[in-house]
Every structure is written in structure tokens, then in C-alpha cells.
Design a protein with these regions (language model features):
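Active-site neighborhood of glycoside hydrolase catalytic domains
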Residues: 2-87, 92-96
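Flexible, acidic glycine-rich loops studded with aromatic residues
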Residues: 91-228
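Short beta-strand segments enriched in hydrophobic/aromatic residues
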Residues: 145, 305, 317-319, 392-394
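Exposed beta-strand and adjacent loop surfaces of beta-rich binding modules
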Residues: 177-180, 310, 336-338, 408
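Accessory carbohydrate-binding/adhesion or oligomerization-edge regions at the termini
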Residues: 203-294, 322, 353, 387, ...
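Short beta-strands within extracellular/lumenal beta-sheet-rich domains
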Residues: 291-304, 373-375
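A short beta-strand element within beta-rich, extracytoplasmic domains
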Residues: 307-333
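Beta-strand-rich ligand-recognition modules
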Residues: 326-327, 332-409
Length: 433
């Protein structure tokens, strides 16, 4: 990456990359890279930096090309005209493909921010660069994994970032083309069951889970069936910044609520993980079209179990990005906003958090904050219908403890080892078999 993201280069060589001395060193490094890697392309970066030397990028592009390589560069980044670069890599919402320059689309493809169940829906449904098929200007797509935070187990890269499920989702979309929208359409929310888009995702999910059981057997594959998991979610009640404030759904489940002169409805959602507001705010839609700070939502469903049984539970209310310095919740709390969970009116307590530090640092690894990074919670399901009730307050969308607040929930019953969804369960907010 050049000339930005280069503080380590400066510490090591005591020269800025854009200086004459820095450019000489870079060319020596490029010599070694080009000799070592027998690949047709080399990505040189150029994003998130102030350019102080207008000759830097053109000279580096020319040098890499002189080594027989084609050059890729970020967009946004250095601005090129056709012929001045071989390919651009679109990394943010502002990235735009340019006629005459092939582009790679990886906007919103950052696995380090993905949750377990919501983001894969958007990834699978989304057209690549909102195009039905590739062209001379749209070369394809890439998934990115920026794991800025220290890891103490390399398999955490695979399981917490959902590498294999998302890899299969993007591979199918890139191979087949198509898709139903871009990320800014329905976003992470599954469409209604009677739509072709839902049926396509359900078919993909079925085939993906076959690959989990066969092709990826023995590998960490953090995904279970979610297209059968149905919820009722209320409109959000204004809490005035009081996360503990009690609202009518805590007294009685109804289709409509009247509170302080206003009417609050209930709508259905499908999925084991639901974003009420996405990590990227309104860029990627969640359940609420216009989510507001200082509100409290409720989600509930009934789960039919064919027998009394002990099962596992995946539950989380802030999926921790792997590139952030966010602090783990305080012991006994699910998050910093006061989320709570009940099964059959019995409150489910949190696991014991293994990360207890209170100083934000990229050099301290995540603990068991994310539900797939720990053993499922052991819970009991009665024979018959079981009530699952969630309280989901939100304060501000920015807070000191977690930089990127995700107003969300993940709740699904799994086998005690976390490998599969519990068979024979029916998730129905209306108790319909």
C-alpha cells in the first residue's frame, strides 16, 4: 500500500514514501515483490492519503509496468484517465467505475464488519456494482477482510468473519451474475416468503448447508438455517435516553400498542439475525427505514419444540467488528445499551466475558464477545410452544465503548455443539404450525 498507511515504512526507513529517498527504497522493494510473485497484477493502494508529490503515483505505476505487471489502484484514491492504470478497486460507497478502466467492486464487502446472518443476505442478493453481468468496465468483485485487531487463534479469522459462508455467497453471485438489487435496496433484510428473491436465497441456503456438511466438514463454518426463523418486531418507542424504561410490550403482546397518545404497530421479519439499524447507518437499510437514537424496540416469537429438550442458544446484540478496538460488555450485561432476553419469561443471563480490559487497544485480542466465538448457551425448551422475547434499547449511534454501534440482535437455537440448527423447531410469532 502506497503512499498511505505507511507509518511503519517511515519508522523503519526514516523517509516518507513520497520523498526521493522513499521512492528509491520502494523501487527496491518492488523489485523483490515482482521477482517473488509470479502474478499478472500488483495492487499499489493510493487511498486515504494526502499527495505531496504529484509525480509519485505516475512514476510508481510506470515502474511496476516496466516489470511486466499490470497495476491496480484504489478508487477513491489517485484519479486516473483511461490508459494511466490497468484496473481500479472500488472500496467505499464513493467509489465509481470509470469508462475505459476495468473496476473491481468491493464496496460493503468488508467481512470484518459482517454479522453472522444479516450481511450475507445483502451480499447474496446484491448485484455486483449493480450490474446484471460483467463487462469490459466491470471486472468482478472481491471480499475484504481487514483484521486490524490482534488475534490469538488464526481460525478466529475464519469463524468470526464468516469466511466460508460469505465466500460461497459471493462466488455464486459472481459466477451466475444477476441479483435482485444493490446493497442500498432491501439491504440485510430478507424479503417476504412469497417473493422470488426469498425463494432464491432459501435455495442457496439449502445448498450452502449441504456444502457445510460435506465439502467443509470439520472446518469452522458459522452458519445455520435461518429462513424459517420468524419474528414480530414492534415500532420503536422513544425512551428519552433511559435504556431501562418499560413499555407496553413488556406487559402484554399485541398487534398494536397505544402509548402517550401515539400508536405503535408490529411487523414481521425473517432471519436469525436482524439489523434494526445497520453498522453503516442508512447506506445499508435495516429493519427500520428511519431509525432514531434513544428508542426501544421489542422482538418476539414463539418456538414450538416437539419434546422437552436441552439445546444451545446463539445470542448477541452487538456483533463485534474484528477491526475495531471496542470494549467487551460489562459482566452481566449483553451490551452497553441494555438489551435483554427472556425464554418463557425467564431472563437469560450473559456468558462470562473473557475480555475484561477497559483500555481500548488493537493489541488486545477479542474474547468471546461474538456468539460464534464461544460455546452456545445451554437453555431448556419445553414440549410445545416456548416464548422468546427480546428488549432492544438504543441510545446514541456513537459511543465511547463501541465505535460502530450495531442496533441488532442474533437469536437462534442450535445443537449444543453449535454445528446445526435444532431440528423440528417451528418459529412462529402467531403460533402457527
Amino acid at each position: 500500500d502506497m503512499p498511505g498507511h505507511s507509518a511503519a515504512f517511515v519508522r523503519a526507513f526514516r523517509h516518507d514514501m513520497q520523498s526521493p529517498e522513499g521512492m528509491k527504497i520502494l523501487k527496491l522493494l518492488l523489485d523483490e515483490v515482482c521477482e517473488t510473485f509470479d502474478v499478472p497484477y500488483l495492487h499499489i493502494g493510493t487511498d486515504e492519503v494526502e499527495f505531496t508529490n504529484p509525480h509519485f503515483v505516475p512514476e510508481m505505476v510506470a515502474y511496476v509496468r516496466s516489470k511486466g505487471k499490470k497495476v491496480i489502484s484504489w478508487n477513491p484514491g489517485w484519479h486516473y484517465k483511461p490508459g494511466e492504470i490497468d484496473m481500479t478497486h472500488l472500496w467505499s460507497y464513493r467509489g465509481k467505475a470509470q469508462p475505459g478502466i476495468p473496476a473491481i467492486d468491493s464496496k460493503f464487502h468488508y467481512l470484518n464488519h459482517f454479522d453472522v446472518f444479516g450481511d450475507i443476505v445483502a451480499l447474496y442478493n446484491s448485484r455486483i456494482y449493480d450490474q446484471a453481468e460483467g463487462s469490459e468496465d466491470i471486472a468482478g468483485t472481491i471480499l475484504a477482510l481487514w483484521h486490524d485487531r490482534l488475534i490469538d487463534n488464526e481460525w478466529n479469522l475464519v469463524i468470526e468473519n464468516g469466511l466460508y459462508p460469505n465466500m460461497l455467497a459471493i462466488a455464486e453471485r459472481a459466477w451466475r451474475g444477476g441479483g435482485t438489487e444493490y446493497f442500498d435496496g432491501l439491504g440485510t433484510i430478507l424479503p417476504p416468503e412469497d417473493t422470488e428473491a426469498f425463494k432464491e436465497f432459501a435455495d442457496f441456503e439449502k445448498r450452502m448447508l449441504w456444502h457445510k456438511e460435506h465439502t467443509f466438514k470439520g472446518y469452522p463454518f458459522a452458519y445455520v438455517k435461518q429462513t424459517n426463523v420468524k419474528w414480530n418486531i414492534t415500532d420503536a418507542f422513544p425512551n428519552g435516553g433511559d435504556m431501562d424504561k418499560v413499555f407496553p410490550p413488556e406487559q402484554e403482546l399485541k398487534d398494536t400498542y397505544h402509548y402517550n397518545g401515539n400508536t405503535y404497530g408490529v411487523r414481521q421479519a425473517i432471519g436469525a439475525g436482524i439489523y434494526l439499524r445497520h453498522v453503516w447507518g442508512t447506506f445499508v437499510p435495516g429493519f427500520y427505514a428511519d431509525p432514531k437514537e434513544d428508542h426501544t424496540a421489542y422482538a418476539y416469537t414463539w418456538v414450538y419444540s416437539p419434546r422437552d429438550q436441552e439445546v444451545g442458544l446463539w445470542a448477541e446484540f452487538q456483533n463485534y467488528s474484528r477491526s475495531e478496538m471496542d470494549l467487551a460488555p460489562l459482566q452481566g450485561k449483553w451490551d452497553y445499551t441494555g438489551s435483554r432476553l427472556w425464554i418463557n419469561d425467564r431472563e437469560i443471563m450473559t456468558p462470562v466475558w473473557t475480555a475484561t480490559h477497559q483500555v481500548k487497544s488493537n493489541e488486545i485480542p477479542l474474547g468471546n464477545e461474538n456468539c460464534v466465538a464461544r460455546s452456545p448457551l445451554a437453555v431448556h425448551l419445553n414440549k410445545g410452544w416456548n416464548k422468546v422475547f427480546l428488549k432492544l434499547p438504543i441510545g446514541k449511534f456513537k459511543m465511547a465503548e463501541t465505535r460502530l454501534v450495531k442496533w441488532m440482535f442474533t437469536t437462534v437455537f442450535v445443537t449444543p455443539d453449535g454445528e446445526k440448527a435444532v431440528e423440528g423447531l417451528i418459529y412462529s410469532p402467531d403460533k402457527q404450525k
